[in-house]
Structures are given as C-alpha cells and as structure tokens.
C-alpha cells in the first residue's frame, strides 16, 4: 500500500476545515457600541472611558484616595493633553488617569476634515479617529517604556479594543460627569 503524500493531505485537511468555517454575518461581525445614526464628527461634548486590556493596573495606584501616577500614567496624561495640538477642533476638559482606565470629557468644537485629493472626497474626522490615534500613540510610547525603562509588560494589547462614550447634552450632564471623574480616586475600590 502506498503512503499518502503528506503535503497534499495537509492541504486537503486545511481546505475541508476552512470550508466548514465560512463567514457567517450573524456570528462574525463586530457590533458597534456607538449610537446608531449619530454623526460623531459633529460638534459636541463626549464622556470617554478607555480601559486597559484585562483591567491591568499599569498607570499608577490610588493611595489615600488620591491617584499617584507612575511614569506610564504621566506619559498617558501628556499624550492626552497633546491631542489639542494635533486636532485644532478638540477641547479637553476634565480628565482622570486611573490605575487601569482613563476618563475624560472631550469636546469637538467644529467639523474638521482630512486633506483630500480629486479622487477621494474629504473624510470628516470623527471621535473614533481621535481616540484611535490617541490609543495608538499611547501603545507605541508604552512599548518604548517597557523596552527602555522596564515598565510593566502587558499581554497582547495594552488597551481594550473599543472605548466607551456618552454624548453629554446640557450643562447639568457635563457637571455631573465632571464630578464623577473628579471623585473617581476617592471612590476607588482596591479589589
């Protein structure tokens, strides 16, 4: 009896497995947590929360109800504050770095668009674009800190894939969220 050709056998096995795992839009899609139909490039106030992957405590610690930033926490803070220099239409308000997450109130003051060519129309810059750029820069800087300064290592990704936002409508809503952000270190539960 002849031995089967191993590369052909592996190819056929892989083909059979992959054919059984076809794309199913009911199973294989990312659900957006953004408000459906809302234009996130338009002016508005947003409450933002960004979490570390697996809630890893990488940015400092809370002591005596005060947040003590480590070097990584200071880096995150500096990158957040730099957003207003990168985006002319962004105003930053209340924010708080926590050991495993970050809260802020961000205001988009006007519609902005990236440069376009005749072949591609202007793309408006959205809240997701701004937060995505911030998360990318923070990750690159954090990796540099791990390599150069021995910051705590992380597995896989530094930050969770998404971010949470709430559209703030009205001054009372903004004041309530600003108080929540301010009080975050006081209400921290070290579990």
Language-model-detected regions and their locations in the chain:
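Short catalytic/metal-binding and nucleic-acid-binding patches
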Residues: 1-191
